[in-house]
Amino acid sequence: DSLDRGEPLVSGLVSEPNKSMFVDWAPYLGHEWDMECDTTIDIHTLQTLAHDTNSMPDNLPLQRQVAKILEDRRKMAAGAMPLNWGFAETLAYATLLKDGFPIRFTGQDIGRGTFSHRHAVLHNQKDESTYIPLQHVSEDQGDFTIHDSLLSEEAVLAFEYGYATTSPKGMVIWEAQFGDFSNGAQVVIDQFITSGEHKWSRVCGLTMLLPHGYEGQGPEHSSARLERFLQLSAEHNIQVCVPTTPAQVYHMLRRQGVRPLRKPLIVMSPKSLLRHKEATSTIEDLAEGRF
């Protein structure tokens, strides 16, 4: 009846936009793709963060191998062991959080990491509760949210792309369970991530981590489909990076957050290099180096 009378069918129409939801994009526009960025940090600050990210409540019983990983990371922080990939990645996030950058991390197996290198979420072996050290870096840190997602690459990656296009200050990260599985979201990669800026002037700082390796798991687990991303690369629309040392991944992630350029970052993350004895760095490499 209301339709026949030409009356509105909704009780209230929004006449003015909610300006509190507006984002100031000015700081993130007009930058050259190769702009320099200082990703160094005071080594004492880094050592403090290294200690804090390996601290946990006394009453948290951990699985034996996880406890050993944290014990090794304490040795790495003290200089008694070289740093591996997982610890360098954790420190990159910790430094950004300390400086107030929010981080949103989503994927199918990200708390642990596909190849068990990350362990950003610690599980109590008795009551199944969890503890997330990166949420306890400092009192005024940026928000750190981490979500193991449903098994739909297309749905989750599309949502994270949208989130990243409206949240330029922080880092939005999506990790495939295996990089090859990203083809389940190929239409999102083709139509939005690699071409959205050119078509709609929508800049996006989304980071995609694509773990893969030739070590034993066969087809659909081995290449992260690198060739597809290279074919989609044109006019500096995306960054495709293949870091090979812990220091490189540390400075690469810090650069993605610190510098105001917002371009999608596609990371060909490895398997064997996560624990390779020759793929290590020192804490000085993290404090002083660059990507």
Model features per residue range: what roles?
Residues 1-291:
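Flexible, glycine-rich loop/tail regions that form catalytic "lids" or insertion modules at the edges
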